[in-house]
Structures are given as structure tokens and as C-alpha cells.
Amino acid sequence: MAVEKVNSSSSLAEVIDRILDKGIVIDAWVRVSLVGIELLSIEARVVIASVETYLKYAEAVGLTASAAVPAA
């Protein structure tokens, strides 16, 4: 995948359009411990994408119902 280098500034609408078109995944993991005792553990994966982009990639990795049904 090639990286495009653009010298002009982007508007907020262009940035949001690009994020929805390509998608972005934020993976976070937090653990709070006190004296070796785990008090809190949080794991989160946030996916930001358009429905079309999500379905395209979800089908490619087998996360949709249509991908789970074998072809007859």
C-alpha cells in the first residue's frame, strides 16, 4: 500500500470521509493494580468505519453470516 504525501491542509470533512472510507481500529488495554492485586481490567476494541467498509472487511475475514454459510 502506497502512502500519499499531500502538502495542502485537509478539512475536517475530508478527514472524516477518509476515516470512514478506510476505517480505523483503536485497541486499548488497561489494568489497575494495587500491591500486586488486580483491581480493574478493561479491554476495548473500537472500530470506526462506514457500514460498507465494515461489511467488506468483515466478510473477508469471515465475520458475517453470509461468509459462515458454505457454498453449495
UniProtKB/Swiss-Prot annotation:
Places the protein is found: Gas vesicle shell
Superkingdom as given in the UniProt entry: Bacteria
Record carries keyword Cytoplasm: no
Gene Ontology MF annotations: structural molecule activity
Induction context: Constitutively transcribed at low light (5 umol photon m(-2) sec(-1)), transcripts decrease rapidly on a shift to 50 umol photon m(-2) sec(-1).
Record's keyword annotation contains Nucleotidyltransferase: no
Keywords for the protein's UniProt record, in alphabetical order: Gas vesicle
Entry's Gene Ontology cellular component terms: gas vesicle shell; vesicle membrane
Role noted for this protein: Gas vesicles are hollow, gas filled proteinaceous nanostructures found in some microorganisms. During planktonic growth they allow positioning of the organism at a favorable depth for light or nutrient acquisition. GvpA forms the protein shell.
Other facts: Gas vesicles are 65 nm wide and between 300 and 2000 nm long in this organism.
Subunit structure and binding partners: The gas vesicle shell is 2 nm thick and consists of a single layer of this protein. It forms helical ribs nearly perpendicular to the long axis of the vesicle.
Family from the record: Belongs to the gas vesicle GvpA family.
Protein name as annotated: Gas vesicle protein A
Organism of origin: Pseudanabaena galeata (strain PCC 6901)
Gene name of this polypeptide: gvpA
